[in-house]
UniProtKB/Swiss-Prot annotation:
Protein localization: Golgi apparatus membrane
Name of this chain's protein: Golgi apparatus membrane protein tvp23
Topology in membrane: Multi-pass membrane protein
A GO biological-process term: vesicle-mediated transport
A matching Pfam family: DUF846
Coarse class of the protein's main subcellular location: Golgi
């Protein structure tokens, strides 16, 4: 008797299960590409300045792509920063897609959040190694830039997710409360 090969289940780390595979592959490509260029760029490109610039460009592309494209398409979240020109105050604005109109796959969610939290942890590890080695302060500056960009996105998307969950809960409670009051009022009038 032949056994059927197991079909991948939603939520597994398999890019083919993604609702947006191209978005996911670019997202992971930028995240992994910056780390690989930092770690192995000097082996293939002998010019340190070129490795620094390429790594910085990949980090910038990762920051932009995650903030403006991948977050919105993979998990339905987006954030930006607004500055009040008169007072100079800075506020973060969070946006989430309507959960009733958009379904987010478990695979996309898992890839997104895992990558979002693992990448800064890897950069922190590389920062510790750069401090221990003390071989070049310039490498530490590149890691500091990478940490600033990845941690900013991590904190912003974490807050955006909390905001999204709170607003979803508030909307469901509000709509449930309004409907129960409306139904109670109608039933009360019928049986008076």
């Amino acid at each position: 008797m032949e056994q059927q090969p197991l079909q991948p289940q939603q939520g597994e780390l398999n890019w083919r299960l993604s609702a947006h595979p191209i978005t996911l592959l670019f997202f992971l490509g930028f995240r992994i590409g910056a780390l690989l260029m930092y770690l192995f760029g000097v082996l293939f490109i002998k010019n340190f300045v070129l490795v620094f610039i390429i790594t910085l460009l990949i980090l910038s592309a990762d920051f932009y792509y995650l903030k403006n494209i991948a977050g919105r398409r993979l998990v339905g979240l987006r954030w930006w920063n607004e500055v009040n020109t008169s007072s100079g105050d800075s506020t973060w604005v969070f946006e989430s897609s309507d959960p009733t109109t958009r379904t987010i796959t478990a695979t996309d969610k898992r890839f997104f959040w895992l990558s979002l939290y693992v990448t800064p942890a890897l950069w922190i590890g590389l920062a510790i190694l750069a401090i221990i080695r003390l071989s070049s302060v310039i490498w530490l500056s590149l890691v500091a830039i990478a940490l600033a960009l990845t941690i900013t996105n991590t904190v912003a998307f974490s807050r955006c997710d909390r905001f999204s969950q709170a607003s979803t809960f508030a909307n469901s409670a509000l709509s449930g409360g309004v409907m129960s009051n409306l139904a109670g009022g109608l039933l009360g009038r019928l049986f008076k």
